[in-house]
């Protein structure tokens, strides 16, 4: 983009209104609350990932056990032909 497409440059330092002490304290309070919220969300996300991992491992373990315990070869070894009835 060229300079004409970007728009005019704004100099904030010269024309920006000065913030009073109450506004600065309010900004710090909001920033602290936001940091607390971010930490809480990170903790919740970590716990959700751990729970999802545990559930995934459990599902794979149950699936693996069921495949191992009911193998096709063992299942067909016990199969007997039905006896034919002679009339």
UniProtKB/Swiss-Prot annotation:
Its main location: mitochondrion. InterPro entries: Coa3, Coa3_cc. Disruption phenotype: Deficient flies show developmental delay, lethality, and a dramatic decrease in the levels/activity of COX. It is a single-pass membrane protein. The chain crosses the membrane at residues 47-69. GO terms for cellular component: mitochondrial inner membrane; mitochondrion. One of its GO terms (biological process) is positive regulation of mitochondrial translation. It comes from the Eukaryota. Keywords: Membrane, Mitochondrion, Transit peptide, Transmembrane, Transmembrane helix. It is found in: Mitochondrion membrane. Plays a critical role in the biogenesis and activity of cytochrome c oxidase (COX) (complex IV). Belongs to the COA3 family. Encoded on a bicistronic transcript that code for two proteins mtTFB1 and CG42630. This is Cytochrome c oxidase assembly factor 3, mitochondrial. It comes from Drosophila melanogaster.
